[in-house]
């Protein structure tokens, strides 16, 4: 066999091998079209056989999921391979389409498509209304704590309304006690004494240590303090007055005496008294008496400053003021009596 024939046979053999290789390649590409696109074709070898170069895959480490503090509004930022993502993105946008055809000659060796979220993509935030707001709806019923305030006031006792101050002037020779009690004749108002100033010439005090229970002093005494109250009570249609006065007096020599007033309290000079009247809780003042309280008071008869109480059980006596209300020694009470017109001041019948 000549050399030309040998070369022709070798060329024919190589062309047949190349044709068979191309035929096998076409069958393999039809079975796996997707893989053939991602595999670059290169011609190598001594006989010109087509070879397929396996692309290098760059395996990226899986990104850890980090929950967002926003709850349901959190957005997942993950890089998924192109073959596993299915063309979906985390933001709900349109799927990314793959390019068909032969890959670029000078493109990257990796055949994966990296799908990631745009870091600058806007995230949607849903604001939830606060649970504490009621939409401005007004609640019905009694506000909390109002009932407890009423219970606290009831524990302090009954309350009065319509407090009105009065300034009374008692002339010399008039009874201070009668002047104060005259305010209660105009209606169901209670009276309380706040202060007083002036001089007293005759006073009868209640002292249980003495034999008679009361003692009367004559002279000139300055009022240090005067307090007390008078309140009207109605029981079975009958009205009665309860209350009384307490006084503290100072003599010219500096001695102090005082106690509960059990008789007359005669003024030695004009006495100014500040009192207050009010309506007790649960009582109403008649309309015809509104505004008439304190405008006028009955004129009381004058009593001589030197008058001493006369009682059936004890004779009249005169003397100087005692240093002690209990008597005995150098200074003894000038007059003691077992009874008098003011001994029942705590509960007097209504006129």
Curated annotation (Swiss-Prot):
DNA-binding region: 97-109, 138-149
Domain-related comment: The PPC domain mediates interactions between AHL proteins.
PANTHER family with a match to the protein in the record: AT-HOOK MOTIF NUCLEAR-LOCALIZED PROTEIN 10, AT-HOOK MOTIF NUCLEAR-LOCALIZED PROTEIN 9
Main localization, broad class: nucleus
Region (Disordered) location: 1-151, 310-351
Motif (Bipartite nuclear localization signal): 97-105
A GO cellular component entry from the record: nucleus
Cystine crosslinks: none
Record's subcellular location: Nucleus
Gene3D superfamilies tied to this protein: Hypothetical protein, similar to alpha- acetolactate decarboxylase, domain 2
Keyword annotations: DNA-binding, Nucleus, Repeat, Transcription, Transcription regulation
Biased composition (Low complexity): 23-37
SUPFAM superfamilies: AF0104/ALDC/Ptd012-like
One function term, GO molecular function aspect: minor groove of adenine-thymine-rich DNA binding
Name of the protein in its database record: AT-hook motif nuclear-localized protein 10
Domain PPC: 159-301
InterPro entries xref list: AHL, AT_hook_DNA-bd_motif, PPC_dom
Function of the protein: Transcription factor that specifically binds AT-rich DNA sequences related to the nuclear matrix attachment regions (MARs).
SMART domains: AT_hook
Bias (Polar residues) ranges: 60-77, 310-325, 334-351
